[in-house]
Amino acid sequence: MRLGYRFCRFLCQGCCAVYLKARCFGVGNVPPAGGVLLVSNHQSFLDPVLTTMALYREGNYMARDNLFGNPWFRRLIEYLNAFPVRRGTADLAAIKESMRRLKQGRVVLMFPEGTRTPDGRIGPLLPGMFAIAKKTGVPIVPVLIDGMFQAWPRHQLLPSPGNVIIEYGQPVVPGQFEELSAEQLMEMVRRRLIAMQHRWHRLLPERRLEWYRPDECPDEMNTGCE
């Protein structure tokens, strides 16, 4: 890990721990070497920081292309391993760059909802990102962010103090999905993320949302669905 990246990581850890009371669980589920695809739900602009600050490896992630317009900010996010993606299109250049970095043995973070949640729930996922995992043969680690929607909903200009949880789930290894289509793999990962979120909301009932349809929940979680 580069010294400058390590410093930024340390700074983010301190700020998020104090202001957002951010806690990370399951970091050991991220393999220590080799290409890894982190698949996270998307609650706020801070999600790339929250999902990578606890890792002992540098994270790589897509960022909206309009964030690269300012040369100073561009230098910063490129140093932090961001690369541009055009939203609303099948950006082949971004897909190829993701695959290149995964094949180099890096950690790549993606938010397959494509946009921030409007209500805190995990929305439909885009299957194209799961096709990347199938083509590169890397493990997928589902990552849940919970509490950032309450701290920084879409209509709010700046984040409020919060109580944020980041959980890294058990990896989905290639042997578990090589026979699945990208759509089936997408649904498997989404259901895991929903189950992770549901478990935290059972422990922290003040966060409980209007829940998902019963057919969206794993069987053991149906008691919390509408």
Regions picked out by a protein language model, each given a short descriptive name:
Residues 27, 41, 64, 88, ...:
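Generic beta-structure capping elements
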Residues 4, 8-10, 17-18, 31-89, ...:
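Catalytic core of membrane glycerolipid acyltransferases/transacylases, capturing the structured
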Residues 17-25, 149-150:
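Short gly/ser/thr-rich secondary-structure transition/capping motifs
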Residues 3, 93-226:
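Non-catalytic C-terminal accessory region of glycerolipid acyltransferases
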Residues 22-24, 82, 140, 166:
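Generic structural signal for residues in well-ordered beta-strands
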Residues 28, 90, 146:
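Residue-level "edge-of-site" marker
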Residues 21, 35, 163-165:
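A residue-level signal for beta-strand positions that form part of recognition/binding surfaces
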